[in-house]
Each structure stands twice: as C-alpha cells, then as structure tokens.
Amino acid sequence: MRYKNVLFDLDGTLTDPAEGITNALMHAQRRLGREVSPREELFVFIGPPLIETFMSEWGLTRAEADQALVYYREHFGTKGLFENVPYAGIGDCLAQLKAAGLRLYVATSKPEPLSLRILEHFDLLKYFEAVAGSTMDEQRTKKGEVIAYALDTYALDPSETVMVGDRKHDVIGARENGLDCIGVLYGYGSREELTAAGAAALAADLGELSALLKS
C-alpha cells in the first residue's frame, strides 16, 4: 500500500451532520434576531470553520461571529451533535482498513471534545488511533492547522499519510502540509470543487475509497 496513515475528516465524510448543524444555525439566527434561512442554504456551513463562515456568509463582524458561535453551541452542544447519522457502511469500511494494516486518525475542524463525543456515541471511536480537532477557543480551526497538529503530535510522515475529506478545505489543508487528499463525493463538496482544489483522487462511495486506500 502507498499510504500507512489515513486522516479522516468527520462532517460529510464519516457522518452526515446536516440536521444538527442546520438546527443549531437556525437557533443562532433566532437568537441574533435574523430571518431564519431555508435549511438547504445552510449546507455551506458544513465543513469549514464556523467563525470565518459566519463572517463570509452572513456578513458578520468578528465580534458578531463570536456571539453567533456562542448561540450555535447552545443548541449543538446539547442536542445538535447527536442529530447526526453515520454514513451507511462506514463502520465496516473502517474495520476493513484497520485490518489491512492502515493506521486511522480523525482530523476535523470541529472542536475536539465534541468530535470525541460524536465518535463515541456512534461507536466509531474504536477504529481510530487518535482524534485531532479544533480548539474550543478557536485558536486552531483551519484545516491546515489541524492537519499540522496531527502530523506533529502523532509523528506522522507526510509522505506516508493521506487526507480523506469532502470539501475543498480538506484538500487545501492537506496540500499545505505536503499530503495527498482523496475527495469523497457522497458528502457536501462537488466533483468540481474538489478537483479545482487539487484532490489527488476522487471516490464516489466507500467501496471506491477503500480500494484507493488499499492500493
């Protein structure tokens, strides 16, 4: 196999978090006194760091975005994190990859404590060597920063490590750290988005992903 270590994104790659994230965003909009958006318009928030997306999508200042995050977490931290569904077959896929000798990690822009709770709740934590996420104080949120932290903390060789994710932020963050990235097409990023960002390969489903990782 070309790779020894695999860094998995969480949202849109291991689980589909749309219901919980969008419900939390709607809660934040109500608390901010904003009009509540149609659910589909909020899918753009799935994947990238929230603060920068609040600013770019809602036109908030940094201070307003910080407050929006507080309101978002009121819902997400209690209910939203479990309004979430693992992709069908993901457990079997991870078990097979682990059995093949690959070392699996999670690298996510979601706060690390919340990520651990989600993975444990859905019985997925057992497949991973470790979980690298963002910090609750927003000091480490960009995907490149999270990947750099994972590589350094777990002493992973970039030439033996690959990122797997569904958005351009996964690809860009991987490339910033000298990693290939395999883009998955069952999440929230399009073929065009992932290709333009420079994905090394694309997988339409878990079967294709498993084959690419084991090749």
Which stretches of residues belong to each language-model region?
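A short, structured active-site edge motif that brings together acidic residues
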Residues: 125-139
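Conserved Lys-Pro-Asp/Glu-containing loop-to-beta segment of HAD-superfamily phosphomonoesterases
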Residues: 5, 142-171
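Conserved H-loop
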Residues: 35, 61, 125-129, 157, ...
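Acidic, Mg2+-coordinating phosphoryl-transfer loop and its flanking beta/alpha structural elements
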Residues: 162-203
